[in-house]
């Protein structure tokens, strides 16, 4: 399980250091793709395979299902660590997430999310005030 929040810088070549505990959980080979809310999602291979199976079962006759799977899979790339524990984030994914220099890496249960520092701070500031309301709505899901 991934949890926690860390700040790191991305270098001019697009390489980002991921915290050691997240590297361990992601394994030697993992998948990064476009995430929701203008961030990136990183999945260990086993989680990615499970997600892929669920998404493959969506009805391709539905426009929303086609649009989502196109967006999600076209941005996906398999990654490995370099000797310094960094991952090279492709330019298209850096652009999607607005990554310039400072990044925030967060653990979210079965995945790691990578945010530009500015977008994370904006998202957090907007969401923090409604945390209680969101929690009340989740009661409907028996959480």
From Swiss-Prot:
Every SpoVT-AbrB domain range: 5-47, 76-119
Q: Which domain of life is it from?
A: Bacteria
Query: What Gene3D superfamilies does this protein's entry cite?
Result: Transcriptional regulator MraZ domain
The Gene Ontology CC terms held by the record are: cytoplasm; nucleoid
* Record has DNA-binding as a keyword: yes
Q: Which GO terms describe its molecular function?
A: DNA-binding transcription factor activity; transcription cis-regulatory region binding
Q: Where in the cell is it found?
A: Cytoplasm, Nucleoid
Q: Which terms are listed as keywords in the entry? A: Cytoplasm, DNA-binding, Repeat, Transcription, Transcription regulation
**Pfam families named in the record:** MraZ
A Gene Ontology biological process term = negative regulation of DNA-templated transcription initiation
UniProt KW Transcription regulation keyword: yes
What protein family is recorded?
Belongs to the MraZ family.
Q: How does it assemble?
A: Forms oligomers.
Q: What is this protein called?
A: Transcriptional regulator MraZ
């Amino acid at each position: 399980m991934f949890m926690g929040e860390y700040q790191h810088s991305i270098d001019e070549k697009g390489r980002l250091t991921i915290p050691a505990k997240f590297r361990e959980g992601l394994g030697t080979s993992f998948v990064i793709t476009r995430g929701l809310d203008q961030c990136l999602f990183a999945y260990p291979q086993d989680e990615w395979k499970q997600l892929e199976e669920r998404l493959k079962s969506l009805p391709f006759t539905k426009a929303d299902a086609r649009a989502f799977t196109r967006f999600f899979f076209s941005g996906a790339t398999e990654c490995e660590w370099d000797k310094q524990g960094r991952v090279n984030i492709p330019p298209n994914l850096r652009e999607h997430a607005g990554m310039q220099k400072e990044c925030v890496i967060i653990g979210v249960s079965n995945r790691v999310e990578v945010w530009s520092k500015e977008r994370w701070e904006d998202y957090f500031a907007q969401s923090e005030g409604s945390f209680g309301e969101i929690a009340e709505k989740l009661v409907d899901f028996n959480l």
